[in-house]
Amino acid sequence: MQSSVYFDQTGSFASSSDNVVSSTTNTHNISPSHRSSLNLNTTSHPHEASGRGSASGELYLNDTNSPLAISSMLNTLALGSMPQDIASSNISNHDNNIKGSYSLKLSNVAKDITLRECYAIFALAEGVKSIELQKKNSSSSITSASLEDENDIFIIARFELLNLAINYAVILNSKNELFGPSFPNKTTVEIIDDTTKNLVSFPSSAIFNDTSRLNKSNSGMKRPSLLSQRSRFSFSDPFSNDSPLSQQQSQQQQQQPQQPQQHSTQKHSPQQCNQQQVNSSIPLSSQGQVIGLHSNHSHQDLSVESTIQTSDIGKSFLLRDNTEINEKIWGTSGIPSSINGYMSTPQPSTPTLEWGNTSASQHGSSFFLPSAASTAIAPTNSNTSANANASSNNGASNNGANQALSASSQQPMMQIGNTINTSLTSSNSLPPYGLMSSQSQHISNMVNTSDMNITPQKQNRFMQQPQPEHMYPVNQSNTPQKVPPARLSSSRNSHKNNSTTSLSSNITGSASISQADLSLLARIPPPANPADQNPPCNTLYVGNLPSDATEQELRQLFSGQEGFRRLSFRNKNTTSNGHSHGPMCFVEFDDVSFATRALAELYGRQLPRSTVSSKGGIRLSFSKNPLGVRGPNSRRGGSGNPNPNVNMLSSYNSNVGHIKN
């Protein structure tokens, strides 16, 4: 070998006192573990029998400052490894190389334990030399007096390596019921060095698991690159572990801002409930601020929902459930923020009335008090806000309203109020599928300009008032909807007069329209002719009828529908070319809700024929005018009585009589 030749040729260097370190000092400074790793075993050196050269080579190897020793130490270190890996590798190497006799003692065990059970406990342990079942008297040479337990029976397992004893001691110490539920006491685990008779401390199970998991994660991590910053022109390996780690970090960063937003939505929901209660208890004149708060919360909720729903972009709209589609269409989440702002923002032309106003009861001039020349004040009762407002004013508002109505029963201003109410309910800007009751149609049918003490110019002015945007129907309980005052008064006194029984039934029928009916209505395709897109009313137009259709089969088809009232059937006139366009049919129902359900259920129904029509089934749409009513001024009337004076007087007297009772 070159080293031996080198050592033999440099005798002067070996004999020099400046460069040679004594072997006693070197062996004293180097630990036994480092000796074995550096191959500094003096007894097994290959140059042991070579006289002077062997002595010089031995001294040179024992020198820690020699280049060979330094190179061997560097070879044992992993290049680019983390400091944790270096420390753990040194500790593991040190533990693995510490050999001796270590006893693992299990005390506080069951008294009836056998040696077979002791072997079963250590069946999965490695490096076990012997297992004994001893008593306290016979184990006095092994344990000290401080280690004695109350139980005089214990198990001793001897290990050769300390790390194996520590590993199994941690496993046994983590078991609370080592001997099953019949012996619930926790077993005491101790490690004793047989040479020194001292206890050897070992980590607890939680710390040991954390350190082992950390070591595994550190060992499995990719060696960090020397280049901390990569160039944007460099190619990135798609199979490296960096990309999934970066994706997970980005996902965690996206989820973290979403969590406080979800908490904010949960915090907003009780606030909205409280605001709804406040909205139902305050006067209508001061509801603008609360409505503004509703709009602000709606904007926040929509922004939160838009951020949460970004994860569902990849889902196809056709794969969604019908209920989810209906919620998107009819729920508040599907309404744009601008429309929601229009819904909740009160317009200046919105008619309002304060039920608890003392001036109305003191003056007694009229139930309707015009506040300006260009604006009309009419009673506005909604299902949630105004109705709760009228019932939550401690009875004072009800007394004021009753006095005002009794005073107005002998004055002509009640007629003006009915006219104003008619102008509001019969506006031409009604939304599609708006839900109005038959009572509003009945009241609008009562009103005629020739019977009212009001000029046509005033009525036209009332008719030209823009419809408030918040009268667009949304299927929610917190959205105010316009309901005529006669509905409220008649439903309140329905148990006192039999004439209001049908009215209350119509009210419950209109309020009982559910989201399922609206979902059925949403599936109906829009009419091909834009002229057929009429606002909802209680009358349906039946189109696309075959030329041989009869009134009997249509009556049989529609009479089974709930709320069916009557049917009008007639054939169209023959044109000059001799062609007939088929019969024409109108079907009237008790309420708009019944007409809506019938339209949703019977749209596209085929009449029983021997051959299937190529034009498809019947096409239903809302009629331009209710049955028996002509002209735009009195549309939406639900009664076929040609004399509106009788309807007006009878309804007027019945309403006043209900309030007096």
Swiss-Prot record:
Spans annotated as Disordered: 14-58, 237-280, 383-410, 469-508, 613-661
Tree of life domain: Eukaryota
Xref: Gene3D superfamilies: 3.30.70.330
Entry GO MF terms: mRNA binding
One cellular component term from this protein's GO annotations in UniProt: endoplasmic reticulum membrane
InterPro entries on file: Nucleotide-bd_a/b_plait_sf, RBD_domain_sf, RRM_dom
Biased composition regions of type Low complexity, renumbered to the chain: 14-31, 237-272, 383-409, 496-508, 628-647
Record-linked Pfam families: RRM_1
In-chain residues carrying the UniProt-annotated modification Phosphoserine: S231
UniProt function note: Involved in size control and cell cycle.
Additional remarks: Present with 5730 molecules/cell in log phase SD medium.
Name of protein: Protein WHI3
Organism: Saccharomyces cerevisiae (strain ATCC 204508 / S288c)
Designated gene of the protein: WHI3
